[in-house]
Amino acid sequence: MHTIVLATQKGGSGKSTLAIGLALAAKEAGHTVRLIETDPQGTLSNWQSRRGIAEPMVETIYNVGRIEARLEALARGGVTLAVIDTASGVSAVTAAAIRCADLCLIPARPTITDIESSAATLKAVRAWHKPFAFVLNQTPVRGRRIDNAAHALRGEDAREMNELVARPFISMRNDHQDASASGLAVGEYAPTGKSAEEIRQLWRWAEARLNGLQRHSRSDAISPVRLASGVAQNAETAPAQPLPAWDACL
């Protein structure tokens, strides 16, 4: 079983909407999926209550001591993908989820405040040496601001671009909000729309990344954890460096 954790310091970045979209895209692709909610705000639970459909099941876990054991039980029960939605900030529960992740996705809108706020989440992810990627979310349909934000997030090493910033960027369209209000994922609400296709492509990107990490692990290759532009491998002994070029997003 693979575990994807969506985490970020700042609220309003679209973690829950992305979690729902990725879960349904993975289900469409044949996975047995479980959505796990660790955010007391209850966005996923409220979505499921509007949905009236059992799958994918949403589980709430607010106790830090339950996460690892529950993930192990889900794997034994045949679940192939767990998608964990977390509260804003880095609480003890969020830290536990990150510790169990195979891949951490850090959503960020293409704004200076979102990009700056991602540093705290990135520090927690690095502390556990977890593979991660930023997801540029709620972006304008077009414009230089998007690419500038992507370059600010990935740092100065162009070789890291494909791993540090997920593709495609997720554009801001009404389909996401309308789908959520209807208890649906965007791929169900408007299956032939551009938003649905972006989410499917994002899932394919994430799945390819997960499979690549698994292959590296099995072959005892160099660690797949990719750290941004020159940051030391051990986050506990080296000072974290700020993500560069914030003003490029303005």
Provide a role label for each language-model segment:
Residues 177-203:
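Inter-lobe coupling/hinge region of RecA-like P-loop helicase motors
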Residues 91-112:
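Inter-motif core of Ras-like GTPase G domains
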Residues 16:
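Walker A/P-loop
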Residues 35, 84, 106, 134-136:
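Structural beta-sheet core signal
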Residues 140, 150-187:
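Beta-strand-loop-alpha "switch" segments that mediate conformational coupling across diverse proteins
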Residues 113-163:
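Anionic-ligand binding region
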Residues 3-9, 13, 21-96, 179-182:
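P-loop/Walker-type NTP enzyme "switch/lid" segment
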Residues 216-250:
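P-loop NTP-binding site
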